[in-house]
């Protein structure tokens, strides 16, 4: 059953993950990251304290959870010095900004399916998109796709369920 969702082009036609080099930031984004870093590098040493990582990330509009913070710190502060260099901070923020962009892309795709703006993708929405894309899927196959993504059992796919299934299918 799960394979129906993965084989279909309905969700992937124009939203495939960009394959290639690591995500890169624009010059403006790099400047923004530099300014946030410099704000906390008060002694000009080129490093910030790991305790300030969360605050610096907040300055850039991110709200990392405690588990996320522990993981990031262990990845960038391998020698457990308690300090993070600008390059390490830039690497973390490049990844976080790419993840944010991915989520926004997925939500844009969700809104294309949810043309009646109910906050959910119904069977009718999915059938319309399949027809628009020229996909010849049976009603049964379309229903299987809904069932695969529908975690709360209401017969439709909400934003959270859509995000989960899209990440699970590795289309993003």
Curated annotation (Swiss-Prot):
A GO biological-process term? cell division
In terms of Pfam families, this protein maps to:
EF-hand_7
Q: Which family does it belong to?
A: Belongs to the centrin family.
Tissue expression per record? Expressed in testis. Localizes to the caudal portion of spermatozoa in seminiferous tubule and epididymis. Expressed in retina photoreceptor cells (at protein level).
**Description of how the protein assembles with itself and partners:** Monomer. Interacts with CIMAP3. Interacts with USP49.
Q: Name one GO molecular function term.
A: calcium ion binding
Instruction: Relay the record's extra comment.
Output: Binds two moles of calcium per mole of protein.
Q: Which residues bind Ca(2+) 1?
A: 41, 43, 45, 47, 52
Name of this protein: Centrin-1
Q: Where does Ca(2+) 2 bind?
A: 150, 152, 154, 156, 161
Span list, region Disordered: 1-30
The GO cellular component terms are: centriole; centrosome; cilium; cytosol; microtubule organizing center; photoreceptor connecting cilium; spindle pole
UniProt biased composition (Polar residues) = 1-14
Keywords, comma-separated and alphabetical: Calcium, Cell cycle, Cell division, Cell projection, Cytoplasm, Cytoskeleton, Metal-binding, Mitosis, Repeat
What role does this protein play? Plays a fundamental role in microtubule-organizing center structure and function. Plays a role in sperm cilia formation.
Q: Where can this protein be found?
A: Cytoplasm, Cytoskeleton, Microtubule organizing center, Centrosome; Cell projection, Cilium
Q: For the EF-hand domain, which residue ranges apply?
A: 28-63, 64-99, 101-136, 137-172
């Amino acid at each position: 059953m799960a394979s129906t969702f993965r084989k279909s082009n309905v969700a992937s036609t124009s939203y495939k993950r960009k394959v290639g080099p690591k995500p890169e930031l624009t010059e403006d984004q790099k400047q923004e990251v530099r300014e946030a870093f410099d704000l906390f590098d008060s002694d000009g040493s080129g490093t910030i304290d790991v305790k300030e990582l969360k605050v610096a990330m907040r300055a850039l509009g991110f709200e990392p959870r405690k588990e996320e913070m522990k993981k990031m710190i262990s990845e960038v502060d391998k020698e457990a010095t308690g300090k993070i260099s600008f390059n390490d901070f830039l690497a973390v923020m490049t990844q976080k900004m790419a993840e944010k962009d991915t989520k926004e892309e997925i939500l844009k795709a969700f809104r294309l399916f949810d043309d009646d703006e109910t906050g959910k993708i119904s069977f009718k929405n999915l059938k319309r998109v399949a027809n628009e894309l020229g996909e010849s899927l049976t009603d049964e196959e379309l229903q299987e796709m809904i069932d695969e993504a529908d975690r709360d059992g209401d017969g439709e796919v909400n934003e959270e369920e859509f995000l989960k299934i899209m990440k699970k299918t590795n289309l993003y």
